[in-house]
Regions:
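Membrane-embedded helix bundles of polyisoprenyl
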Residues: 63-75, 85-128, 133-172, 181-204
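Short, charged/polar low-complexity linear motifs in solvent-exposed/disordered segments
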Residues: 173-174, 219
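Membrane-interface coil-to-helix junctions
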Residues: 1-69, 110-112, 204-207, 213-214, ...
């Protein structure tokens, strides 16, 4: 099994006990010492054996990757003068590329950090369209939050937020700013902040926190 599975197993074991430490890790290190790449997936390891939970992450990641890439390419082809009238060709190409993306050797322990990017881009681009219904917008917002809950801020989240913010600034300067996309960006940021709040507080020395294992190494 991948080494990241240890983080899921220990965090799942102490998910509801209210403890700030993991007794089995480094003789009782802080919970923030083991961060999970896809925090919401800890529920799988709480309910299922490790091998089954990891398999579920692989299947879910590949599925989201395939669907996201398929929808993204299908949407892009609608605006193409060459491909807009060739739905059969577009469908075949989208299916082929989607399958290729779904079978890329991404590690399942990272959740949607890689697999979920095409679907995120698709949702963000559709939010720019003003003719979307409220129900559709809510679905796009829901996926943005779902992506944040099942991806890592360190692995891909910071890059997504940064590139997205630059895009919003450029759009604002060109007077093409989308309020819906701005709301989605804020939702993703808040999701990451909620997930990593304890870690940020420890980094900035806010409140009481346990001594990190790295600090203990330095002291000894």
């Amino acid at each position: 099994l991948d080494g990241e599975v240890i983080a899921y197993l220990l965090q799942a074991r102490h998910l509801w006990d209210g403890s700030d430490i993991l007794p089995e890790f480094m003789n009782g290190a802080a919970r923030t010492a083991l961060t999970m790449p896809a925090p919401a997936c800890v529920l799988l390891y709480r309910l299922l054996p490790a091998e089954t939970a990891l398999a579920c992450m692989q299947v879910a990641g590949s599925f989201v990757g395939y669907v996201g890439m398929f929808l993204l390419l299908w949407w892009a082809a609608e605006d193409s003068e060459i491909l807009s009238g060739r739905k059969g060709t577009v469908g075949f190409l989208a299916m082929t590329v989607g399958c290729m993306y779904a079978y890329l050797p991404f590690l399942p322990v990272y959740g949607l950090s890689q697999y979920g990017l095409p679907m995120l881009l698709y949702c963000v681009l559709r939010l720019r369209e003003r003719d979307r219904s409220i129900r559709e917008r809510l679905l796009y917002y829901a996926y943005v939050v779902f992506f944040g809950a099942n991806s890592s801020l360190v692995l891909s989240g910071f890059a997504v937020l940064g590139i997205w913010a630059v895009g919003e600034i450029i759009a604002a300067l060109r007077r093409k700013y989308s309020t819906a996309q701005g709301i989605a960006w804020i939702l993703l940021l808040l999701t990451y902040l909620l997930e990593n709040g304890a870690l940020f507080l420890q980094i900035f020395g806010v409140g009481e926190s346990t001594v990190s294992h790295k600090a203990e190494y330095a002291l000894t």
